[in-house]
Amino acid sequence: MSTVYYPSVILKKSPLPLKLTPARASGNFGTPITAALQRASFNITIITRTESSSTFPAGLPIIRTSYTLENLTTALAGQDAAICVVGPGGIGAQVLMIEAAEAAGVKRFIVDDFGWGPGFRNLPEFRAIHAHRRAGWELAKAKAQANPNFTFTGITSGNPIDWAMKRFPLMGFDIARCSAIIYDSGTEKFTATTLAGIGQSVVGVLQHPDETANRFVKVLSIITNQNELLEAFQRVTGRQWPVQRASAQTLIESGQQKFQAGMGGWVLELVVAQMYDEGEARCVMAPSWEASDSPLLGVKKESADEVVAKVLQL
């Protein structure tokens, strides 16, 4: 059985060795993760807050409950695995979810990462956000060390490239206008995973419990840069895209000023800036697809043209 927090989703009575619980099955990552689990023939039960207005895939059982240790422990009873995909707004609840999962006898807890992982050299403005995530990661690690029946996995997937490029023109590509912003030389490499790849990474972890126990796995669909993506957009759309030149350092300065002034918008600016900050290689999680955990977990290697086609279809 499995549970996903949909805050939550629980996968029950799976034909596979594990039963799972995913958290936040309706969100940006929860939706493709839940779809991948369904394709892999896991049975899913959703756990969500009583007051949640989220919509969920048709036909899935839903448990609506308040997020207390007692209630979550009851909801998780009998589950083999729990998958936390609560996102930044709910990350503070991950500690409670881990406590409940261990108390309920859950065998595997997939912690909320789906980003850059514990070793990421992020900008100082992200330290508070990272500390919230790390609190859950450290608790899961401690629980696993103390209880041999409880294990955890973190999935470091880098930039969610098709979703991010479609949603955020500041990342360099305005899909609606077919125009681009290229930061500096456009050659800074970064690793990224498509939504389909993120979903498959969860399935792969659950299908390879021994190889993925008590560690962060690193997955990717592509290693690329802005110039490669621009060429792909132009090939796939069959037209030249006008290009505006910009600087990652200017974006860093703008984001830091907004952060210090208590203004909104700084998170996106600094997320984009640290990805394109030339020569830093902050956002390369593995030197190649082959050197990552992608082959083990069944995450496909994709070309720039394939990724761009997915962006245009979203």
From Swiss-Prot:
InterPro entries: NAD(P)-bd_dom, NAD(P)-bd_dom_sf, NmrA/Isoflavone_reductase-like, PCBER-like. The keyword NADP applies. GO terms for molecular function: oxidoreductase activity. Induction: Expression is positively regulated by the oxaleimides biosynthesis cluster-specific transcription factor poxB. Keywords: NADP, Oxidoreductase. It comes from the Eukaryota. Pathway: Secondary metabolite biosynthesis. Its EC number is 1.3.1.-. Gene3D superfamilies: NAD(P)-binding Rossmann-like Domain (3.40.50.720), UDP-galactose 4-epimerase, domain 1 (3.90.25.10). The keyword Ribosomal protein does not apply. Belongs to the NmrA-type oxidoreductase family. Isoflavone reductase subfamily. Oxidoreductase; part of the gene cluster that mediates the biosynthesis of oxaleimides, cytotoxic compounds containing an unusual disubstituted succinimide moiety. The first step of the pathway is provided by the HR-PKS poxF that serves in a new mode of collaborative biosynthesis with the PKS-NRPS poxE, by providing the olefin containing amino acid substrate via the synthesis of an ACP-bound dec-4-enoate. This is Oxidoreductase poxI.
